[in-house]
């Protein structure tokens, strides 16, 4: 196992900080070990990126695109290796990590089109000369990646940032360093010029050193709202720096007037329990009518949830849920469940830590109707679904909006009129009808309002924050106007 895990100025370096490791949360074994980057190595990474900016930005778009497309080819050639690496570090089943690598490949075509359509050249005629809108890169940007999609989500920042002409210092989650290392190795094989993409590994202190670096022109972050808020406060008073945040959610899913109970339960489970509930778009609150249909949906949901297969990511018979990211994350979900029970909630399906030394938990359902007004507005990042029974549709929408977040929301209903009513009143950046709320098109804006973030990270609209527009009025030679303003004589 190599100790050279920091990629700076085109070379791999051993860390100068403290010992760090990555643990497979399913197999409970160490799969990566190194030393974190020191503050001096963070400085070196930023300096390396700064030195590369002029040459990289001066490349034509086609030249930059060629490197990115070569990376895409290498992804395709190494898709099985990368899917297994993601599974080992996150615990996610291989069927799911394979789709993550596929999304990484798909991001390249989306980002190419986005650059041309959203930040390409626009020319407008004028009576004298021409008006142009062009775009320039910010310069040096930091990319902070999350652990739940350690390949796809950082890639959604990195690809459009490189296409726009930025140079990057990438700080991945300390829980998924091996995915980052192997991804950057593919970028290296793609032939990126030295300094264009740098990698620093570490924990909180490494992230703080990078985020606070005075020579950054921007920071692109995907992760928790708590960390995102700290970054937002840190960047206050620095209007010259671009800050793109994609954060958490406390997402509502409302069900009313459906005809197919099994289809409804399927979409609820996909919304709440896919990725062991570790998607920022996962449904956290399920609103069911307080009537016989609501009772039937809940009974079927409980039945199917109890039979969800949880298991190893590489099992021949693939599970729906793998392990959570760590044993600590699993324990935190048990504690969150207990907190809600102490506040007056009722357990319908107990979330259980199946192996205290692993990340395996069973999915849980808890009825919070009796204490919904006192329920903490927290993002419980795991497979725990909170059920609220309602009599009034507008009341359910109001409770769904009663959050500082605003990422995703959905309605399961056979009535389009109800959906239009819901759509006009719900507050979220992603609003779905009769589809799981964890699903979003890579060609559509991805993000939310409130404490779910700003900008629209990791999708087609990422091009917007990777470059800034420049307006120009241009004429081939200096020309004296035919009509002079009053008071001028030539």
From Swiss-Prot:
Pathway: Amino-acid degradation; L-arginine degradation via AST pathway; L-glutamate and succinate from L-arginine: step 4/5. It holds the Pfam family Aldedh. GO terms for biological process: arginine catabolic process to glutamate; arginine catabolic process to succinate. The keyword Oxidoreductase applies. SUPFAM superfamilies: ALDH-like (SSF53720). Its EC number is 1.2.1.71. One of its GO terms (molecular function) is succinylglutamate-semialdehyde dehydrogenase activity. Keywords: Arginine metabolism, NAD, Oxidoreductase. The active site is at residues 246, 280. NCBIfam families: arg_catab_astD, PRK09457.1. Catalyzes the NAD-dependent reduction of succinylglutamate semialdehyde into succinylglutamate. HAMAP family: Aldedh_AstD (MF_01174). This is N-succinylglutamate 5-semialdehyde dehydrogenase. It comes from Pseudoalteromonas atlantica (strain T6c / ATCC BAA-1087). The lineage of its organism: Bacteria, Pseudomonadati, Pseudomonadota, Gammaproteobacteria, Alteromonadales. The gene is astD.
């Amino acid at each position: 196992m190599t100790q050279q895990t920091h990629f700076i100025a085109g070379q791999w370096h051993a860390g100068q900080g403290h010992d760090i490791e990555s643990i497979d949360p399913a197999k409970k074994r160490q799969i990566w070990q190194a030393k974190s980057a020191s503050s001096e190595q963070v400085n070196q990474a930023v300096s390396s990126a700064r030195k590369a900016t002029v040459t990289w930005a001066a490349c034509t778009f086609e030249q930059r695109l060629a490197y990115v497309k070569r990376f895409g080819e290498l992804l395709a050639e190494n898709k099985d290796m990368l899917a297994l690496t993601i599974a080992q570090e996150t615990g996610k089943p291989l069927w799911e990590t394979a789709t993550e690598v596929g999304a990484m490949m798909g991001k390249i075509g989306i980002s190419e089109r986005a650059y041309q359509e959203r930040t390409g050249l626009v020319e407008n005629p004028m009576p004298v000369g021409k008006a142009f809108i062009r775009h320039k890169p910010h310069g040096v940007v930091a990319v902070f990646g999350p652990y739940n999609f350690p390949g796809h989500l950082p890639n959604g920042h990195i690809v459009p940032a490189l296409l726009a002409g930025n140079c990057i210092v990438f700080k991945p989650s300390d829980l998924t360093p091996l995915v980052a290392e192997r991804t950057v190795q593919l970028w290296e094989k793609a032939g990126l010029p030295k300094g264009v993409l740098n990698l620093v590994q570490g924990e909180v202190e490494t992230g703080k050193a990078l985020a606070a670096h005075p020579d950054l022109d921007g920071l692109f972050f995907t992760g928790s709202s708590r960390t995102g808020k700290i970054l937002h406060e840190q960047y206050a008073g620095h209007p010259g720096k671009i800050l793109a945040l994609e954060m958490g959610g406390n997402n509502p899913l409302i069900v009313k007037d459906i005809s197919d109970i099994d289809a409804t339960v399927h979409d609820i489970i996909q919304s709440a329990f896919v990725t062991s509930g570790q998607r920022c778009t996962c449904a956290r609150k399920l609103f069911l009518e307080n009537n016989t249909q609501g009772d039937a949906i809940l009974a079927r949901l409980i039945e199917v949830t109890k039979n969800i297969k949880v298991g190893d990511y590489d099992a021949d018979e693939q599970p729906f849920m793998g392990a959570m990211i760590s044993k600590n994350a699993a324990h935190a979900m048990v504690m969150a469940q207990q907190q809600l029970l102490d506040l007056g909630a009722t357990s319908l399906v107990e979330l259980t830590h199946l192996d205290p030394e692993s990340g395996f938990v069973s999915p849980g359902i808890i009825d919070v109707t009796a204490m919904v007004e006192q329920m903490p507005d927290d993002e419980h990042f795991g497979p725990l679904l909170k059920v609220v029974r309602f009599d009034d549709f507008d009341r359910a929408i109001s409770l769904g909006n009663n959050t500082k977040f605003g990422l995703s929301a959905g309605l399961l209903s056979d009535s389009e009129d109800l959906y239009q009513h819901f759509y006009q009143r719900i507050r979220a950046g992603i609003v779905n009808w009769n589809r799981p709320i964890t699903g979003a098109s890579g060609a559509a804006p991805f993000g939310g309002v409130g404490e779910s973030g700003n900008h629209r990270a990791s999708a087609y609209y990422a091009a917007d924050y990777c470059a800034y527009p420049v307006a120009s009025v241009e004429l081939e030679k200096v020309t004296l106007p035919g009509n002079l303003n009053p008071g001028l004589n030539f």
